[in-house]
């Protein structure tokens, strides 16, 4: 077998059917094979180690030919006013990064087509040529392009950052030159006749600036952060100023040692003093509402006795003491002693668990009270007037003192004695019923009613743990004489049964 010439010998990895040599392939054909547009058929085959070295040399030559400098990558603002945003041309970005099909590789980037006005604007800035004005150009957001270069092309981003720094340095230099030129022009002498006018204009501008600054401080920047103390300072609110005699400090404003006299001390009401151990306490400590009573019937009987005695003997004094409680401050010390002395003999048998004055005021019948009169009222149960009740008989209606509800006593299952008692005080219906002691309508499940006057009481307001079974009468409806109780026997009944 004869040896062929050096040009006729086939290479080890070359296909016999392919007349063209891979090493002799032109750069243009190589670019067509590497492109992803799909317009030309791609000829690919397995290469040996010798062909791989040749392909690397070819790719390096292509990159050297297609190098795009970072100075040509332009960032512009559109629209050029204050509302504009910064963009880059996709064609320039793809050439700078060396990506042939940029849209296919990064489809998630926000892009838009350039308008005709935008192309003319870029043509004036010498960003594009006249030929490119007729082509379809695409704009990308500059912040997304910068993020892409930071993540995937750090070397390209570093090169582009150097160019940006040089441009910023050049801009500052140009600005300084303009400022120096303006300073040289301003060194010219100003006419003396125009100096007062310039002074007035300067004063007017300063006044406008100060007024705007103060207005912003009062409206927009009232609070500020103190850097030294790390405290947010807020303007102090407006307060009413008391006269000087009301704020004058006394000779003994505060006690320096325990037991020393001072001007500031708590003033107790007469009812509060009855619970305090001043030689002898008049009242037992009030029962805890959460603890069950030992004998609810006995306690209610004792309370009724005390209430009856209070109703007969202590009408005037209870009114006066309730006035002191509502005012919140007791009389002076000398008047307190005399007032306490008068009350001492009259209030010994009053109800021990709550304020006797407050209960007597709320539970007593108002003198000269006249019930409400509603001429055309209807019963809320049978929906009939006073001419006929549910039994077809004429019967007068009773009316709630707080709302417009009315009803026949027979429809409400009330006796004649109860109706006569209701007409002596401001009666309340079931919807408006409040506790006589605390005056609150809450805790309906713990509210009970007197069988004589239909007044409402909370169980915890009268010292009961639960609603007693059977007949229950409040303190103000008791008729039996009161039974005295000793202070030492707390929680026990004084009478048997």
Curated annotation (Swiss-Prot):
Tissue spec: Widely expressed. Expressed selectively in neural stem and progenitor cells (at protein level).
Record-level GO cellular component terms: chromatin; kinetochore; npBAF complex; nuclear matrix; RSC-type complex; SWI/SNF complex
Pfam families for this protein: PHD
Compositional bias of kind Polar residues: 317-327
Basic and acidic residues composition-biased segments: 337-358
Main subcellular localisation: nucleus
Keywords: Isopeptide bond, Metal-binding, Neurogenesis, Nucleus, Phosphoprotein, Repeat, Transcription, Transcription regulation, Ubl conjugation, Zinc, Zinc-finger
Record-listed cross-link Glycyl lysine isopeptide (Lys-Gly) (interchain with G-Cter in SUMO2), residues: 240, 384
Identification of the protein by name: PHD finger protein 10
Region named Disordered: 1-61, 284-368
SMART domains named among the record's database cross-references: PHD
Family: Belongs to the SAYP family.
GO biological process: chromatin remodeling; nervous system development; positive regulation of cell differentiation; positive regulation of double-strand break repair; positive regulation of myoblast differentiation; positive regulation of stem cell population maintenance; positive regulation of T cell differentiation; regulation of G0 to G1 transition
Natural source organism: Mus musculus (Mouse)
Record bears the keyword Transcription regulation: yes
Gene Ontology molecular-function annotations: zinc ion binding
Subunit structure: Component of neural progenitors-specific chromatin remodeling complex (npBAF complex) composed of at least, ARID1A/BAF250A or ARID1B/BAF250B, SMARCD1/BAF60A, SMARCD3/BAF60C, SMARCA2/BRM/BAF190B, SMARCA4/BRG1/BAF190A, SMARCB1/BAF47, SMARCC1/BAF155, SMARCE1/BAF57, SMARCC2/BAF170, PHF10/BAF45A, ACTL6A/BAF53A and actin. Interacts with ACTL6A/BAF53A, SMARCA2/BRM/BAF190B, SMARCA4/BRG1/BAF190A and PBRM1/BAF180.
UniProt keyword annotation of Transcription present: yes
Region (SAY): 88-294
Function summary: Involved in transcription activity regulation by chromatin remodeling. Belongs to the neural progenitors-specific chromatin remodeling complex (npBAF complex) and is required for the proliferation of neural progenitors. During neural development a switch from a stem/progenitor to a post-mitotic chromatin remodeling mechanism occurs as neurons exit the cell cycle and become committed to their adult state. The transition from proliferating neural stem/progenitor cells to post-mitotic neurons requires a switch in subunit composition of the npBAF and nBAF complexes.
Segments of skewed composition (Low complexity): 1-13, 284-295
Matches recorded under Gene3D superfamilies: Zinc/RING finger domain, C3HC4 (zinc finger)
Biased composition regions of type Acidic residues, renumbered to the chain: 296-307
Region (Essential to induce neural progenitor proliferation): 88-184, 291-333
């Amino acid at each position: 077998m004869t040896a062929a010439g050096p040009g006729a010998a086939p290479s080890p990895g070359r296909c016999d059917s392919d007349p063209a040599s891979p090493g002799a392939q032109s750069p243009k054909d190589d670019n067509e094979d590497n492109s992803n547009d799909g317009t030309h058929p791609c000829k690919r085959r397995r290469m040996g180690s010798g062909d791989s070295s040749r392909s690397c040399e070819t790719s390096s030559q292509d990159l050297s030919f297609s190098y795009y400098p970072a100075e040509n990558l332009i960032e512009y603002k559109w629209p050029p006013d204050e509302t504009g945003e910064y963009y880059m041309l996709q064609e320039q970005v793809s050439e700078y990064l060396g990506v042939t099909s940029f849209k296919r590789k990064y489809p998630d980037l926000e892009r838009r087509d350039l308008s005709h006005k935008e192309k003319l604007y870029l043509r004036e800035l010498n960003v594009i040529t006249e030929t490119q004005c007729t082509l379809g150009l695409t704009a990308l957001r500059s912040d997304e392009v910068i993020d892409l270069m930071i993540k995937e092309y750090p070397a390209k981003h570093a090169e582009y950052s150097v160019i940006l720094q040089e441009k910023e340095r050049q801009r500052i230099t140009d600005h300084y030159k303009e400022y120096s030129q303006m300073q040289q022009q301003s060194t010219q002498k100003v006419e003396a006749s125009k100096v007062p006018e310039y002074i007035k204009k300067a004063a007017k501008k300063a006044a406008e600036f100060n007024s705007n600054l103060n207005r912003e401080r009062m409206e927009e920047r009232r609070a500020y952060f103190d850097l030294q103390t790390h405290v947010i300072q807020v303007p102090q609110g407006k307060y009413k100023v008391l006269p000087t005699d009301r704020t004058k400090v006394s000779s003994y404003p505060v006690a320096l040692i325990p037991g020393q006299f001072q001007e500031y001390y708590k003033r107790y009401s007469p009812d509060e003093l009855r619970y305090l151990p001043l030689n002898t306490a008049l009242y037992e400590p009030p029962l805890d509402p959460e603890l069950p009573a030992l004998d609810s019937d006995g306690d209610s009987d004792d309370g009724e006795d005390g209430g009856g005695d209070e109703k007969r003997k202590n009408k005037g004094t209870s009114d006066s003491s309730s006035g002191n409680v509502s005012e919140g401050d007791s009389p002076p010390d000398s008047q307190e002693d005399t007032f306490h002395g008068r009350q001492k003999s009259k209030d010994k048998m009053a109800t021990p668990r709550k304020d006797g004055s407050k209960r007597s005021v709320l539970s007593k019948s108002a003198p000269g009270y006249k019930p409400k009169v509603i001429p055309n009222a209807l019963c809320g149960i049978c929906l009939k007037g006073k001419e006929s009740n549910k039994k077809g008989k004429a019967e007068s209606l009773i009316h709630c003192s707080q709302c417009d509800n009315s009803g026949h006593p027979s429809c409400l299952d009330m006796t004649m004695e109860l109706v006569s008692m209701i007409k002596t005080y401001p009666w309340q219906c079931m919807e408006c019923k409040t506790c006589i002691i605390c005056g609150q309508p809450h805790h309906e499940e713990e509210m009970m009613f007197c069988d004589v006057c239909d007044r409402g009481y909370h169980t915890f307001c009268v010292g009961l743990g639960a609603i007693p079974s059977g007949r229950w009468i409040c303190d103000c409806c008791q008729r039996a004489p009161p039974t005295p109780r000793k202070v030492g026997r707390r929680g026990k009944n004084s009478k048997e049964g």
